[in-house]
Amino acid sequence: MPPFAERLQRGLEDENMHRALERFAPSWRQSRQALFEATAAEYGSDYSFVSLRQRLRAAKDEAIAHQQELVARFKEQATAAGAVVYEARSAEDANRYIYELCRRKGITLIVKSKTMVSEEIELNHYLEERGIKAVETDLGEWVAQLDHERPSHMVMPIIHKTRQQVGEVLSRATGREISRENVAEQVAVIRREHRQAFLTAGMGISGANALIAESGTVMLNTNEGNGRMVTSLPPVHVVLAGYDKLLPTFADAMTQIRLLARSATGQPMTSYTTFITGPDRPGKEVHIVLLDNGRSAMRADPRFKEALRCIRCAACANICPPYQQVGGHAFGYIYSGAIGLVVTPFHHGLEAAAGPQSLCVSCNACETVCPVEIPLPSLILDVRSRVVASEGLPWLKRLIFGVLARPRLFDLLTRLAAVGQWPATRGTPYVRYRYLRPFEGLPGLRPLAQLTRWRSLPAFARRPLRDRIGVRANLAATHQEGRRSDEMTVCYFAGCMTDRLYPEMGEAVIQVLERCGLRVVFPRAQHCCGLPALNSGDRQHGVAMAKQTVRMLERALDESGADYIVCASTSCVVTIIQDYLRLFEDLQLQSWLNRTRSLAGRIMDFTSFLLRVLVAQQRLPTLRRLRPGETAPVVTYHDSCQSCNCLGLRTEARQVIRDVLGLELREMRDSDVCCGFGGSTSIEHPEIAERLLERKLRHAEETGATLLVSDNPGCLMHLRGGVDANGRPLRVLHLAQLVAEYLA
């Protein structure tokens, strides 16, 4: 396989693929959602997506926990039905078994239906080196085979190709001119080419969507009839499947059927569902090869064993924004999509995952659609941590996170930067390309200048938030003397980005809280929550900052008697209430885990606090009237990934804009799709970030709105920078700033 950098560049340059994937993703999302909603409406909540995924997760967890018993049961039943079951420890073991079977039977031609496990073990290459021809009969797989490619998607192997490209491949392979436009003609050609192979092959190889332990049955779900021909026509049928395909019962398999096609392609079910229990006629042989190849190591890992639930639906690829920009050959190794980043280290080594995992923007969308609730985002971060532990961090990241973990040094350097940044900002709030362009030739400045070509970067504030509010006694208060019985106190955790880059956002938050009659405490010791380091796989500095934050918040609550901790950065909120828990549990730091759990119940994001506390308790003051000549803005809203995918916030901000403020809200297309920020990913892979940003801003402009609102400083930095760099007619605000503008 070509190196990652080469695969990535090819993916970035393939405009046909970008268009195909960007067309498919929204239509898939709509079809999938409509099907699950329709099923639940017709059959009840037991058939909703949430209920079905919980049932299938439970079945898969049972299979993982009791794998040995299920293997024994499956072997007993399959053998009784006339099949031969072989357990292969490794790729070499499985390949050798199949080759020796061919050699004993004198088989030189094999027909195959789609099986990702055969790709995993590189079976075709192994057999071809030994004089045995293996013909892929799945339409997409065969085109990929003819073009010397691997599948770029686990369900739709050539989703990256246009019909014109398919026509070219078929023309080269057949030596005849095949239509580039007529898909029916292309399919007819493939059908004719395969017929003789079906009739003369000595072996058919298939995968399995499930192995049902109670009966020794193989379940296959396909959309093409080739699967049934491969498994029925040749005298020898080999089923190649991992241990992870085991399910206890037929009922569990039915649950999987209800989830698989909807999750994979947005269709109610596959065209063909086939159950095979032993040979179907005298003289027919069925061999079932159960493959380990790293699965035992995965099962032994308390975190990664959850990945063994995967049913290979590829929903995680379908919804993934970076995948849509680079395709599966780059976003993965052999297995593509988010699950590919997770399982690759176990099947093909950590080095094979090192490049692809860097493409993940941590948007968490994959976890929301996974039909078996695999915590894919956190597992990808675990892979990233292992890559960093093995290969180390780039020197610049080591330097940045080393500074970030030292609050006093960070404070000093950011203040110096605020003074020394004038040549790059000219006194504006932005580091702009036109200011940096004259200095591109200086050492180290060209990469920075190129980053600002499409997105202006924020300038450091001359006066950070802590300086702007430090003179106000009620913000520095650390005692409860004179507190009224009905007075509510909140501890405001601003986050480093708001404090150092966007203090005006923090001032707006404080203004809203105080206008609602709250006493606001701003802990001077607050610093970075550690998110940048943790998202980069730097656990050493990330853990240090996590502990700093927990200590600081505990002390602030003790000294102020605050009722809540409010934060207007949903990324920071998710880091503290979700990521810290996983981190401390993983590191077996029980005391820190308990302390974080105590804090988590007191922390709320600004949007939720505004609605669930301030509005619910009728604390919000009267809104001001429009000034003479003032026109109310038309608003569109961007759902930050952490808000909608991690905290489940979907209607709350819209309620504030429409119902509380009374403003017109126009929904943009794909409002909950990542804007492309992704922390340091937007610096490491700017081409991807730029494309996602361009799409987001285009969708915002299509609404005709004049104001783009979100609730996360990271997204706002990205969106503001794109608007500034390209001169777009949009104003970009945090929701707190919008609310502050309309308070009387």
Where are these regions (language model features)?
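Iron-sulfur cluster-binding electron-transfer modules in prokaryotic oxidoreductases
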Residues: 97-104, 114-205, 209-222, 229-231, ...
